[in-house]
Amino acid sequence: MMTMLIISAILAVLYTGAAIWRNRCLPDSVSAMVYDLPKSGKYLWTVWLWTVTELICPPLFETIPEDYGVLAHCFVTCMMFTGAMPLVKGEKNKAHNALGITAGIFSQICVAIIDAQWLGLWALFVFIMGSVYVQPEGELGRAVKGKGVFVAEAVCWLSVMGSLIFK
């Protein structure tokens, strides 16, 4: 199970790192980059998101108490549909955003059930996003300005991975 989480983490870091390197800045969100890709790239992005999500499934369903399995299933389902949405509709759309938000909410409910201390990572979100207001001309302030969705997605992902790896 740990191997699956490590592979998922490597794939997520490689994709995000490549996107940051390609654009020379943080993306607006993890999925924002898919809309700049050609059609074949959208298929690749969907396969990437599905792979990262499916590699999390066995450890997630093994770790979460049986009574709450439906919440984990809702999280995984929302992630899968979020990955497929760019193929269904070519442009940014409300369904994609709603599914992403719902996946984030379900992921944090799962984290609260598995190991609630990982929800403390949201303090990191407040610190990072607060830097935009405290030092807007500072290096961190300039880097994250307008990137709140990406930072929130990163915190969701880190809390899920942390709760699964260290449980």
Language-model features: where?
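Transmembrane alpha-helical segments that form the membrane-embedded catalytic/substrate-channel core
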Residues: 13-22, 81-87, 129-135
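Physicochemical signature of membrane-embedded alpha-helices that form the seven-helix bundle of GPCRs
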Residues: 4-7, 45-53, 68-74, 96-103, ...
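N-terminal topogenic module of multi-pass integral membrane proteins
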Residues: 1-65
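Membrane-interface helix-boundary motifs at transmembrane edges
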Residues: 34-38, 61-68, 89-95, 137-148
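Helix-coil boundary and interhelical linker segments in multi-pass alpha-helical membrane proteins
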Residues: 1-5, 57-70, 109-121, 165-167
